[in-house]
Amino acid sequence: MSEPEVTSVVDMKSPNISSSCSFFKLKKLSEESLLQPPEKVFDIMYKLGEGSYGSVYKAVHKESSSIVAIKLVPVESDLHEIIKEISIMQQCDSPYVVRYYGSYFKQYDLWICMEYCGAGSVSDIMRLRKKTLTEDEIATILSDTLQGLVYLHLRRKIHRDIKAANILLNTEGYAKLADFGVAGQLTDTMAKRNTVIGTPFWMAPEVIEEIGYDCVADIWSLGITALEMAEGKPPYGEIHPMRAIFMIPQKPPPSFREPDRWSTEFIDFVSKCLVKEPDDRATATELLEHEFIRNAKHRSILKPMLEETCAIREQQRANRSFGGVLAASQAKSLATQENGMQQHITDNAFMEDPGTLVPEKFGEYQQSSASDATMIAHAEQGVDEGTLGPGGLRNLSKAAAPAAASSAASPLDMPAVDSGTMVELESNLGTMVINSDSDDSTTAKNNDDQKPRNRYRPQFLEHFDRKNAGDGRGDEKPIATEYSPAAAEQQQQQQQQQQQQQQDEQHLASGANDLNNWEHNMEMQFQQISAINQYGLQQHQQQQQVLMAYPLMNEQLIALNNQPNLLLSNAAPMGQQGIPAAAPAQPPPAYQNQHMHTQSHAYVEGEFEFLKFLTFDDLNQRLCNIDHEMELEIEQLNKKYNAKRQPIVDAMNAKRKRQQNINNNLIKI
């Protein structure tokens, strides 16, 4: 069991960074903390942005008061990749790699607790300042980044997604590697990897060509990152990513657009990173000895950049707070005017008992006076049902907006805004993963005390989702209070989700019913086919009995088919010889044609009269063929049955397999 380590940290002086503070610096979560529900261990502050496979939130560790970053990953995501990320982070203990503290399974979400880097990513800093970095700043950041790559590569780990968005800075100016969602492990039996993984613009040529790659693939990405920090975007950043994938292996290595602005040492450093032949490319250890890195200045030169970034965030926070207060003031003034307009009518109607809710028809309630016209109705789980005004529940939706705006204006309800850790790129350049690798899993604590009927989702996440909706860059907004107008929308969204879930369940149930109905219909069809076969057999037996009783009928039928006029010439002799008078005379040509036409539809229409006019050989041949024809029909029906049944069975097996994989991963953890 490990306890939080006490460390004194002196931050750089800035408008919103304390000059000196002493607090517990987390090193690893204790066993007691891992056994508790995560919401009892942490206080979630607000959302920072999006990382690979999940959203990242800023939180406070209650026991040590340390600020941490928590990635919440739904179990519906690729659990194998998530566990691989945890495994790699868990094995790393370096000041140049984001530290891993522990993880929880809370019902249907995985909570990954990591080190918090308050300055945010390099791409965030460039975006907020709206300018690129200087050469000295780039050298200092690349020095720490190379230290982190040396640490990983010595342990045969490939990051595979090096870019400015995955290089985080803390308030002390340390650069740390983050987001190991696509990292890989090289083993003794795996000299190189062949999977296409990474972000297209930063991807090495050998990764795109799938010819096998190793740790130096990160060096190519580092060179592209250096160009990104110097010019604001990677090479080919203005074209479509899929087109860039084809251009990177074919074109010469990229370089600076304006080389005159940069020193020869910096240009040479980038050229050694961007060597297309992996065997000729420099390693992280070799690049640490490069003149450009050896001449890098102390990280204290990053202080003005970090202070400027923090000042911009502080200004954005103040602007949002002022805008919220102004909007709340206007809403409050409007609400006062509306109450004043309705007060005269209310006073005339209810003068005796102000402030009392009196029953009205149909179970509704109406207030006696506008003096006490505001009452917040709290529903279960903190859902805001709005404001009860003079019109009672009928005016609920109209009065909810002013009250919610007034509530949202409270400074206590307006948390600090920070774009902090793992905020998505402005251009939304995601990480592309093609194919998959298999790596070992890691350790996490399962905190699923009891399985709920519906998926558990903390209420604060709904606020964050609404707050960040439509913001592709991950900028922060104040948390919506429980009295906000968005609360009603939240309740409506929850109802829609429940309805959708019920529809999905009904769809699955109907699918099972369809399968049962299909099997029942097939059984009925098989029974009908058997009945047809049995009927044909009975007809054949009856025909044989007739032929045995009248042996000359076969010869006469043959003669009838060969000579149509024979029946008329021999009608009297046949009667004299005892042939049954019921023997048919020669049918008219139209009648013959009709029966000839109906022969092909006999089994469909249920007409078997035409069999009387067939010869014994024809009947015998038809009897021999009917078994084969029935077998073909049964085979075709069986194929149709399997074609409709197999997709349902495959879907059910896939769900069982996926559930089994999740259970196996939980057991490993």
From Swiss-Prot:
PROSITE patterns: PROTEIN_KINASE_ATP, PROTEIN_KINASE_DOM, SARAH. It catalyses: L-seryl-[protein] + ATP = O-phospho-L-seryl-[protein] + ADP + H(+); L-threonyl-[protein] + ATP = O-phospho-L-threonyl-[protein] + ADP + H(+). Keywords: Apoptosis, ATP-binding, Cell membrane, Cytoplasm, Kinase, Membrane, Nucleotide-binding, Phosphoprotein, Serine/threonine-protein kinase, Transferase. Residues 460-479 have a biased composition (Basic and acidic residues). ATP binds at residues 48-56, 71. The keyword Repressor does not apply. Its EC number is 2.7.11.1. InterPro entries: Kinase-like_dom_sf, Mst1_2_SARAH_domain, p53_tetramer_sf, Prot_kinase_dom, Protein_kinase_ATP_BS, SARAH_dom, STE20/SPS1-PAK. Pfam families: Mst1_SARAH (PF11629), Pkinase (PF00069). The modification Phosphoserine is found at residues 30, 33. One of its GO terms (biological process) is hippo signaling. Plays a key role in the Hippo/SWH (Sav/Wts/Hpo) signaling pathway, a signaling pathway that plays a pivotal role in organ size control and tumor suppression by restricting proliferation and promoting apoptosis. The core of this pathway is composed of a kinase cascade wherein Hippo (Hpo), in complex with its regulatory protein Salvador (Sav), phosphorylates and activates Warts (Wts) in complex with its regulatory protein Mats, which in turn phosphorylates and inactivates the Yorkie (Yki) oncoprotein. Belongs to the protein kinase superfamily. STE Ser/Thr protein kinase family. STE20 subfamily. This is Serine/threonine-protein kinase hippo. It comes from Drosophila melanogaster (Fruit fly). The gene is hpo.
